[in-house]
């Protein structure tokens, strides 16, 4: 029996299911996203190795170029407000809210030069995805061993200043799509105080109008990205961290609730001062 007619029939059946079922469309789009991540990771890893020969933060520009194309598959648009606040040539800790697997697209839309991320160690073993993260200079934390994680963070604090690095961290510690922010973990703030570098909060509006895992829908939409003013840490000590966490959380939560109330569907009008990401 010919293979191609079977594949064509399966594809037609899948397309029919997608048209008839919102849940089928959701799962098909998520599957495509995962396939894109693995495929692009493999291709980008090869490009990074050919271009830079190994692990370096410079590979992030290559990774970003690939990932920024994902939004065209899904009809997503990112409206970035005050992006210049991320572009200053200085080390800093960038903190942002963490909603879903789609966060990587939002991150790459505004990722500044010489910026690395912190990720859980399990991702290192995720095939080509782990490889491209390693090549991009991502720092992996073993959450099960707090002493090891603290050692990595201490080393990172020194490297930030020495190598003029920006570090991107999700202080909620886990994905959260409940329409609000979770309490922040303190690691990012201890890191900023240790290195005496500013904290730059980045807030993404809620994805819930176009992406919802509970209701199983995944449509096109617009994400508002607000970069807040940097919070200085010069002269602060570990004793100041709880107040620093509270200040940052309140500012980000207020912004999140505000920008998530604006229309997020296609055709929505952006507010003043909005700069579309290219």
From Swiss-Prot:
It is found in: Endoplasmic reticulum membrane. Pathway: Phospholipid metabolism; CDP-diacylglycerol biosynthesis; CDP-diacylglycerol from sn-glycerol 3-phosphate: step 2/3. Residues 24-29, 143-278 are lumenal. SMART domains: PlsC. InterPro entries: AGP_acyltrans (IPR004552), Plipid/glycerol_acylTrfase (IPR002123). Converts 1-acyl-sn-glycerol-3-phosphate (lysophosphatidic acid or LPA) into 1,2-diacyl-sn-glycerol-3-phosphate (phosphatidic acid or PA) by incorporating an acyl moiety at the sn-2 position of the glycerol backbone. It is a multi-pass membrane protein. The chain crosses the membrane at residues 30-50, 122-142. GO terms for biological process: CDP-diacylglycerol biosynthetic process; epidermis development; phosphatidic acid biosynthetic process; phospholipid metabolic process; positive regulation of cytokine production; positive regulation of cytokine-mediated signaling pathway; response to xenobiotic stimulus; triglyceride biosynthetic process. Residues 1-23 form the signal peptide. GO terms for molecular function: 1-acylglycerol-3-phosphate O-acyltransferase activity. The gene is AGPAT2. A motif (HXXXXD motif) lies at residues 98-103. CDD domains: LPLAT_AGPAT-like. PANTHER family: 1-ACYL-SN-GLYCEROL-3-PHOSPHATE ACYLTRANSFERASE, 1-ACYL-SN-GLYCEROL-3-PHOSPHATE ACYLTRANSFERASE BETA. Residues 51-121 are cytoplasmic. Its EC number is 2.3.1.51. One of its GO terms (cellular component) is endoplasmic reticulum membrane. This is 1-acyl-sn-glycerol-3-phosphate acyltransferase beta. It is an enzyme of class 2 (transferase). Coiled coil: none annotated. The HXXXXD motif is essential for acyltransferase activity and may constitute the binding site for the phosphate moiety of the glycerol-3-phosphate. Keywords: Acyltransferase, Congenital generalized lipodystrophy, Diabetes mellitus, Disease variant, Endoplasmic reticulum, Lipid biosynthesis, Lipid metabolism, Membrane, Phospholipid biosynthesis, Phospholipid metabolism, Signal, Transferase, Transmembrane, Transmembrane helix.
